[in-house]
Swiss-Prot record:
Gene3D superfamilies: lithium bound rotor ring of v- atpase. The chain crosses the membrane at residues 13-35, 58-78, 97-118, 131-156. V-ATPase is a heteromultimeric enzyme made up of two complexes: the ATP-hydrolytic V1 complex and the proton translocation V0 complex. The V1 complex consists of three catalytic AB heterodimers that form a heterohexamer, three peripheral stalks each consisting of EG heterodimers, one central rotor including subunits D and F, and the regulatory subunits C and H. The proton translocation complex V0 consists of the proton transport subunit a, a ring of proteolipid subunits c9c'', rotary subunit d, subunits e and f, and the accessory subunits VhaAC45 and ATP6AP2. This is V-type proton ATPase 16 kDa proteolipid subunit c. The keyword Cytoplasm does not apply. The lineage of its organism: Eukaryota, Metazoa, Ecdysozoa, Arthropoda, Hexapoda.
Amino acid sequence: MSSEVSSDNPIYGPFFGVMGAASAIIFSALGAAYGTAKSGTGIAAMSVMRPELIMKSIIPVVMAGIIAIYGLVVAVLIAGALEEPSKYSLYRGFIHLGAGLAVGFSGLAAGFAIGIVGDAGVRGTAQQPRLFVGMILILIFAEVLGLYGLIVAIYLYTK
């Protein structure tokens, strides 16, 4: 340990960066898992009566998976910037924590929205095919919630 550990660069500074990286991947993966599970059960229920629509109905599952990629990107960026405490300020630790929480919680919210919309949309599309376009539009708006978190996280990361 270097003697450069100070009040600006405390020994626990990198802890906040690690928590930011962990928050980014954990919360966005939770959102992606919920979105995948919820829309996947809708696909399974729908495919009993309309098996020809399975591939068309896989879109919500793919969109939920993309949410986890947002968290992965931010987690890797933060993990790559971690350094020993003498070179890692408390300010950077807090910024990285904020970036991880921003993408993580927005990914969690987006995953919930994608799962609920995907489940109802897939089941509705099986009964009325004209609902497909509406489902896709609503899914795009839900996906953008996660993208907003990614943008804020990258902006914070570059500070």
